[in-house]
Amino acid sequence: MKADLVYGKHGRMENKVKSMKTDVLIVGCGCSGLYLALNLPRDKKILMITKSDAKSSDSFLAQGGMCMLKDDADYDNYFEDTMKAGHYENDKKSVEIMIRSSRDVVKDLIAAGADFKKDENGNLAYTREGAHSSNRIIFHEDVTGKEITSHLLDRVRELPNVVLLENTRMLDIITRDNECLGAVIRTEDGSIINVSADATVLAAGGIGGLYRHSTNFRHLTGDAVAAAIKHNVAIKDNNYVQIHPTTFYSKN
């Protein structure tokens, strides 16, 4: 049976179908997926899926803060710190975009409700973390990730053009003639659905759950990366995996 995805007053899927059409399919609902959904045109129908519940995202677990360009005078040092930390293998254009856009992103996060530590004058307070040569890290206590992601999630849930399906797994992406046409998903009730989408975004997190010891949620098993490799999608820097020192141990 084929039918379009029906969006209700509160952004819920109102009919069960075996195939559906949406404008944008976002796999994953961490910071990346949520921020994308909030920045897409409101006339686009968006389907978001997440493998577990929406709050079981590693974005919620991030404790440290996020770096931000305080002023233009800090740009060169910020750029050099980032390149050095990446052994100068970074994509320079991506680093530039990350730095230049950081202030606007922070403004968006604050507008979404995120609260960051302030100094005695009410201005953002900055601290310093690894690889940074100066204080440029904003934070919320020791739960910055939770503070940011929870507010982004709240704002997304308010959008009538977004359907968020929890406990829904992407089984594979759908391709034809080297073009991605959507994905096959399995919903919480076990239904297998072919989702046709004009754009498919894989924002499903990393592979930490595959390791014996990890600070990641166990369900983060690299499904999106595996699907991309299967369909010959170009993968970059997949040899870089951050191992947190607190988990780098064995019984022997």
Positions of the model-derived regions?
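Residues forming the flavin
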Residues: 1-80, 120, 141-252
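Rossmann-like flavin
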Residues: 85-125
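Helix-loop-beta segment of a Rossmann-like dinucleotide-binding subdomain
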Residues: 88-92, 123-149, 208-212
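Short amphipathic alpha-helical patches
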Residues: 89-90, 102-106, 131-133, 224, ...
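Catalytic phosphate-handling regions of large nucleic-acid enzymes and associated NTPases
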Residues: 116, 129-131, 172
